[in-house]
Every structure is written in structure tokens, then in C-alpha cells.
């Protein structure tokens, strides 16, 4: 049916169009609102885009069994849902709920981005099977998860959970308020983990666990306006010190060299493969003791050349070590 006075069109079986300029051009479809349309244009007629629903001023439904509800809401793929003012769903089986929420990306000519879910005002799930939950969240990588206000997961299979949590790089995990995980390596040199408020981990296979724990050092870039327009070109995290296979466990624990281990509150490692055990412990450069002369006899110690060091305290905060067996002396 066509109403010349309002330019309203319902041109298919069981189609409904209500509102100035509303158009419903496929079977079992509903368009309600000024300029609302279901499969408008010559390319969208017939069964191919059946059972679409567009409700709201300028709402658009272009895909089988899709739903767009809200002023300017739109879906462009099959089985998709867009709910909220200017919500957009461009992913097959995608969901966008919230004002300005986005599921899928605008330039996806091969239709690789599917099953993405964005829930929250300005939430964006641009990666295939990505999930963005919360206001201003961003799941860019495929199979990535961002949950929490302004949480961003930008790497493939990355996870960011917590307000302002940020993960970047394949398999990186950031959990906690302002937690940051950045992997910039290739191949198997990925998968960094930062868990705890303001925890930081960068490099490759490094772990920071605890409030303000650090495995490497990061700088957070906060220019959202620039990043929002160029999500693939501008990074939000910048590595100041990258470390590999480092582990920092404890509040404010810090490892700033490869393969180091800091265990305890404010434990600090600044030497390659160094180990700091206990609160406030800190490593120093290793000192080798190859031998010792006693009563004119020279004794060579096994392991006389030290590769690194283990610290159980620091200057002014020394600890005794108990229940330790005697060391070995070599046969020569």
C-alpha cells in the first residue's frame, strides 16, 4: 500500500508502515516512525530481507529477521539487533544495545566480523565474536572481551575487565581498575597478564599480579578523540620498558629485567633473572665467589660463577635465612 499524502509505503505481504516517509518493502516487516525503513530501495525487495523490524525516526532494517529500535538505529546483517538511539549493528548475528553502541565495523567487505556484542552507551564491538560491556567500552580484536566503563580490549583474544582496564596484543589480559597489559611481540612472544588495580605488564609472557604491580613499565595515552577516529593506527599504551618472562606478585612489586621474579609487597628486581623474595626486598648485581683459601688450602666452590642473584631483603632491612643446608665444595 502507498499513501501519497505521507509517502508511506508497505509494498509486501503482511508488511506494516506507519509514519511520514516510512517504508516496509518485504514480507512480514514493520516500519514505524518518520523515515523508518525496512529493506528500502530496489535491491532489498522480496524474501531476502523478510521479517525485519525498524521502529524509530530514521530507523533502518536491512537483513533477515533483524530488529532496529531507536532514533537512527540500524542493522545491516541477518539476525541482528540494534537497540538505542543511533545504535548500529553491522555484524551477522550481532547485538548493539545502548545509545551509539556499535556491533561490527562499517568497512567489512568480506563480512568476516560476526557474532559481536556491544552493550552500553558508546560500547563498540568491532572484532568478530568480540564482546563489549559497559559505557565507552571497546572490543577491537577478534574474540576479545572488554567489560567495565571505558575498558578497551584491542588485541586478538585479549581481555580487559575493570573500569579503564586496557589490554593490547594477542592474548593479553588486564583485570582491575586502570590495569594495563601490552604485548607488542610477534610469534609466541605474547600473552602478558596484569591483574590488580593499576597493575602493568608489557613485553612477552610477563605477569603482574597485585595492586600497582609492574612487569615492565607502561605509559597510558589518553587522547580518546584521536584514537576513536583512527582505532587501528593510534595506540593507547606505550611501552617504556619491555620485559620477557617476568613475574611480579604483590602490591607494588616490580620487575624491570627479563626473567626476573619479585614476590612480596614492594619487592623489586632490576637484574636479569634476579629474584627478590619478601616485602621490600631488592636485587643487586651478582657477585661471583669462585674459591676460598683456608689454612693455605684453596677450595673451589661449585657454581663459582654467578649468573644472577637472590635477595631476601635490602640494605637496612636484612633478613636471616634459616633451615638452609650446607653448600657444596667441588672435588677439585
Regions found by a protein language model. Give the residues of each.
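Glycine- and small/polar-enriched repetitive beta-structure motifs of secreted/surface proteins
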Residues: 1-332
Amino acid at each position: 500500500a502507498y499513501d501519497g499524502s505521507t509517502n508511506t509505503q508497505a509494498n509486501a505481504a503482511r508488511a506494516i508502515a506507519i509514519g511520514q516517509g516510512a517504508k516496509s518493502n518485504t514480507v512480514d516487516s514493520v516500519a514505524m516512525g518518520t523515515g523508518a525503513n525496512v529493506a528500502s530501495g530496489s535491491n532489498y525487495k522480496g524474501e531476502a530481507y523478510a521479517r525485519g523490524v525498524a521502529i524509530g525516526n530514521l530507523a533502518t532494517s536491512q537483513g533477515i529477521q533483524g530488529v532496529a529500535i531507536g532514533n537512527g538505529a540500524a542493522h545491516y546483517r541477518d539476525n541482528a539487533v540494534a537497540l538505542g538511539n543511533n545504535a548500529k549493528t553491522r555484524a551477522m548475528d550481532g547485538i548493539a544495545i545502548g545509545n551509539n553502541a556499535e556491533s561490527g565495523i562499517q568497512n567489512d567487505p568480506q563480512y568476516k566480523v560476526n557474532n559481536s556484542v556491544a552493550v552500553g552507551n558508546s560500547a563498540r564491538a568491532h572484532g568478530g565474536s568480540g564482546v563489549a560491556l559497559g559505557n565507552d567500552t571497546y572490543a577491537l580484536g577478534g574474540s576479545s572481551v572488554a567489560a567495565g566503563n571505558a575498558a578497551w580490549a584491542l588485541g586478538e583474544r585479549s581481555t580487559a575487565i575493570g573500569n579503564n582496564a586496557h589490554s593490547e596484543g594477542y592474548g593479553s589480559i588486564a583485570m582491575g581498575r586502570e590495569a594495563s597489559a601490552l604485548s607488542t611481540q610477534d610469534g609466541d612472544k605474547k600473552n602478558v597478564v596484569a591483574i590488580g588495580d593499576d597493575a602493568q605488564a608489557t613485553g612477552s609472557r610477563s605477569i603482574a599480579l597485585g595492586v600497582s604491580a609492574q612487569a615492565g613499565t607502561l605509559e597510558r595515552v589518553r587522547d580518546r578523540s584521536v584514537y576513536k577516529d583512527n582505532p587501528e593506527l593510534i595506540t593507547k599504551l606505550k611501552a617504556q620498558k619491555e620485559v620477557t618472562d617476568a613475574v611480579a606478585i604483590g602490591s607494588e612489586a616490580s620487575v624491570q629485567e627479563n626473567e626476573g621474579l619479585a614476590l612480596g609487597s614492594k619487592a623489586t628486581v632490576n637484574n636479569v633473572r634476579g629474584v627478590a623474595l619478601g616485602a621490600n626486598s631488592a636485587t643487586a648485581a651478582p657477585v661471583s665467589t669462585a674459591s676460598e683459601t683456608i689454612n693455605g688450602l684453596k677450595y673451589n666452590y661449585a657454581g663459582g660463577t654467578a649468573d644472577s642473584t637472590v635477595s631476601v631483603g635490602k640494605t637496612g632491612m636484612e633478613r636471616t635465612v634459616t633451615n638452609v643446608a650446607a653448600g657444596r665444595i667441588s672435588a677439585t
